[in-house]
């Protein structure tokens, strides 16, 4: 059963055409911690250090995690860039994400934000290696396909193949396409954060795929976006080769 927060995010994004999303704009965010800190606190200092560290550590491999500080003042964080994103664009996205979370979730100890090019998450609680099933939202194209009965199984087939491909890839990332007819293709993406095990990556992706009917039946494009993995399909290419 979906939480009210989950549903509200989905309805908020109902009118969004995915093709028009600006890569520089955040897709969504959650300020998920009820705990706060002050600008001069140890946690605030540790968080600033963590964000600086991630902005230099992540771009070379497209993913990174780190912790700064000790005990209750420890700041834990990770960032993930989409598998096709350049080092320069990854750096820009991670830096922008840290600044934007500071504006949108001021002095909250735990928060997460997504862009087309990256995600960033931090918390005073160690969340590494655990599937994040709480911070999640849907996006879909408002346009419908002509024949959803035949289209929906093809979406599931493509993304299921990409799930199998992604969890076997050290980068936990896969893209691909499926020919629909002589003039059109279906394009897909599956990606996990690399703190997960391979089996947990597949579990996360398969769960995301199973949730597509909640938002995206018969839609020309759709996404299930979470804190540990995301899947996406479109009728146009949306990643760099």
Swiss-Prot record:
Residues spanning the signal sequence: 1-23
Factors inducing expression: Accumulates in response to Phytophthora cinnamomi infection; this induction is rapid in resistant cultivars, but delayed in susceptible ones.
Domain Gnk2-homologous: residue ranges: 25-127, 133-238
Presence of keyword Flavoprotein: no
GO cellular component, one term: extracellular region
Covalent S-S links between cysteines: 81-90, 93-118, 192-201, 204-229
InterPro entries in UniProt: CRR_secretory_protein, GNK2, GNK2_sf
Residues linked to a glycan: 89
Keywords from the UniProt entry: Antibiotic, Antimicrobial, Disulfide bond, Glycoprotein, Plant defense, Repeat, Secreted, Signal
Transmembrane segments: none
Location in or out of the cell: Secreted
One record GO biological process: response to oomycetes
Function text: Possesses antimicrobial activity toward the oomycete Phytophthora cinnamomi (ink disease agent), thus reducing its growth rate and confering an increased resistance to the plant.
Family, similarity comment: Belongs to the cysteine-rich repeat secretory protein family.
PANTHER family linked to this entry: CYSTEINE-RICH REPEAT SECRETORY PROTEIN 38, CYSTEINE-RICH REPEAT SECRETORY PROTEIN 38-RELATED
Official protein name in the record: Antimicrobial ginkbilobin-2-like protein
The organism's taxonomic lineage, starting at the top: Eukaryota, Viridiplantae, Streptophyta, Embryophyta, Tracheophyta
Gene: GNK2L
């Amino acid at each position: 059963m979906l939480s009210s927060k989950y549903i509200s995010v989905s309805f908020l994004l109902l009118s969004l055409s995915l093709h028009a999303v600006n890569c520089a704009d955040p897709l969504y965010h959650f300020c998920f911690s009820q705990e706060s800190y002050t600008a001069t606190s140890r946690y605030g200092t540790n968080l600033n250090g963590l964000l600086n560290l991630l902005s230099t550590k992540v771009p070379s491999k497209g993913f990174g995690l780190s912790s700064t500080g000790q005990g209750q003042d420890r700041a834990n964080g990770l960032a993930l860039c989409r598998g096709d994103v350049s080092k320069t664009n990854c750096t820009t996205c991670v830096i922008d994400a840290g600044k934007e979370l500071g504006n949108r979730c001021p002095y909250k100890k735990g928060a997460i934000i997504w862009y087309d090019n990256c995600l960033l998450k931090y918390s005073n609680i160690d969340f590494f290696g655990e599937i994040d099933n709480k911070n999640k939202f849907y996006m879909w194209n408002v346009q419908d396909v002509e024949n959803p009965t035949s289209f929906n199984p093809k979406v599931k087939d493509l993304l299921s193949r990409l799930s199998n491909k992604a969890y076997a890839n050290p980068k936990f990332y896969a893209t691909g396409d499926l020919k629909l007819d002589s003039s059109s293709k279906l394009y897909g993406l599956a990606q996990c954060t690399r703190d997960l095990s391979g089996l947990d990556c597949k579990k996360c992706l398969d769960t995301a795929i199973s949730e597509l009917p909640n938002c995206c039946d018969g839609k020309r494009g759709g996404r299930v976006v979470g804190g540990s993995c995301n899947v996406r399909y479109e009728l146009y290419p949306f990643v760099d080769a």
